[in-house]
């Protein structure tokens, strides 16, 4: 929960971005959070009685759960559109948000993953970051494109005036 809560957005115009989506199906609890720039999905095996989904404030849920020191088992259930979190010694009723309002986190395509040294990542990013736009009005211009090419990873950034490209050899 603490990892998911760190990804939640602090956008007051879109309160759903401050939420964590909890979904249970087939004895798997899926925890999702996003700030629209970054999405996180964590799957945990659980004991369940029925499937369902609920979106609640990430900060409120994480604060409550992190303060449970003596209880190992936590029960989650929805009651009248809210989330009841209970243990042997305590419980909380947390206001829920409409699940349909939670943004869809894009699925990763079947592209082949590439692995390389973190120092190469830092070197590549530092080489092209000056070309990325500091404004978030057009996100594509404030981003860095990374893609594999033969034994290299190519880093590309532009703000529409400058273009930076760096090829970092990653073959070991």
Positions of PLM-derived features:
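Structural preference for solvent-exposed beta-strand-turn elements
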Residues: 1-172
């Amino acid at each position: 929960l603490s990892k998911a809560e760190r990804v939640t957005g602090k956008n007051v115009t879109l309160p759903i971005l401050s939420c964590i989506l909890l979904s249970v199906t087939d004895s798997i609890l899926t925890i999702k959070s996003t700030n629209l720039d970054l999405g996180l999905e964590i799957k945990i095996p659980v004991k369940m009685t029925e499937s369902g989904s609920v979106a609640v404030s990430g900060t409120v849920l994480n604060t409550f759960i992190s303060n449970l020191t003596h209880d190992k088992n936590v029960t989650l259930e929805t009651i009248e559109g809210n989330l009841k979190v209970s243990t042997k010694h305590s419980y909380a009723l947390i206001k829920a948000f409409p699940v349909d309002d939670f943004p869809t986190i894009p699925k990763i395509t079947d592209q082949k993953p590439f692995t390389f040294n973190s120092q190469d990542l830092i070197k590549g990013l530092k080489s092209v970051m000056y070309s990325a736009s500091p404004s978030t009005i057009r996100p594509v211009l404030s981003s860095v494109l990374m893609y594999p090419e033969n034994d290299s990873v190519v880093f590309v950034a532009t703000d529409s005036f400058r273009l930076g490209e760096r090829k970092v050899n990653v073959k070991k």
